[in-house]
């Protein structure tokens, strides 16, 4: 039996599979939708109970009111459960999509000529279709060259450019395979320098809306340079929202060329393997995933692995063995969080997908090489320069190392309780990959919901400034928090617990 609180975080994308047909706030108060509302609330409660700590909202789809409904449901449920849940806004970003096709789509045959209209709103027909970005102002003819590949619908259709007609705003291509394309399907231009602005008008409106709703994270699509991060940070500062964390989505070869700088400039990265696998050879993706996770550990940043982790669970109950291995080794490599996209947004079995991911994450934590973690990562991480690291984090890491890495019962401690509002110290505790869950006592609501991505961190809201607690108050609150998370994690029997008071480790 695996009896410990899962420390790897799960990010679940919220969509109709979870919140059903609820698309307006009025529907929540309408008795006609009472049954649907009950199911939606039950779904969110179930996935939080199964270990979801971040709800991702994909702003490539849905209206603001639809997303507001989802935020309200999540906040209502999280408050009732007394469990912090972070909200992540995923930007639309600079992407190109097919404008419109007929219901049956547009069938493209191998070796046929395909004409892409770059400044038109035409409905696709006769081997022609139109493309646009979110603003409707982007002209793709400026970003392509003869001989270049264009990938459509996640690479399911490959086109090669044979001619660029700037006068008529057309890109003429030859199809390399058969495929049927549909409305809103994405286009990728591998290795192209896109002339689309990093933050479109739509992105800024979405971000403004998200800030009004108190989001915790922005997953910024198609980050290519440090300048992209700076542009977004400056905008957040202008909006008095510097506390919102930026997760850079790595989706292009240009981003990989700047990867260390991007990691250092952001609060964390998302290995967005879908688009990345189209922009670079797919067989290079595992290497870069490992590199980015390792670099995030080194720079004390958060890492998320995303895209098709349990893709088959959109339609099936059982995951493929390859998917199980994928999730397992993402955690084993040192990921902070594993993410579900279509599995929970539009899949048939969203609750099952979360439950499956929870089991795999916990299993990987059980066999994680904690001794290697001490010997290597703690010596190489940039976080080891701080006094707190040497006085608290390193001793805790050594103290909690299991005696035998392959035996779950060798976990000696269940919880470590630390009172703080210091984000950098929370990051240090998370990055250490302690063999116990860390409960942060905080009176800051931004801190309370702001660490849903951080490995091993569980926040507990208190009334008093955590830095002003007496030792007796700390011990009393520590046990309240421990009992709360013991119940949340369905832990039958507590092992030993620790607390940190004035940088001194004490047994509870």
Swiss-Prot record:
PROSITE patterns documented for this protein: PYRUVATE_KINASE
Enzyme nomenclature, EC number: 2.7.1.40
Residues that bind K(+): 58, 60, 90-91
Cofactor entry: Mg(2+); K(+)
Residue sites binding substrate per the record: 56, 274-275, 307
Keyword NAD: no
Residues engaged in binding Mg(2+): 251, 275
Regulation: Regulated by phosphoenolpyruvate substrate and is allosterically activated by ribose-5-phosphate, AMP and other nucleoside monophosphates but not by fructose-1,6-bisphosphate.
Biological process, per Gene Ontology: glycolytic process
Enzymatic reactions: pyruvate + ATP = phosphoenolpyruvate + ADP + H(+)
Site feature: Transition state stabilizer: 249
Record-level GO cellular component terms: cytoplasm; cytosol
Subunit relationships: Homotetramer.
Family the UniProt entry places it in: Belongs to the pyruvate kinase family.
Protein name per the record: Pyruvate kinase
Organism: Mycoplasma genitalium (strain ATCC 33530 / DSM 19775 / NCTC 10195 / G37) (Mycoplasmoides genitalium)
Lineage: Bacteria, Bacillati, Mycoplasmatota, Mycoplasmoidales, Mycoplasmoidaceae
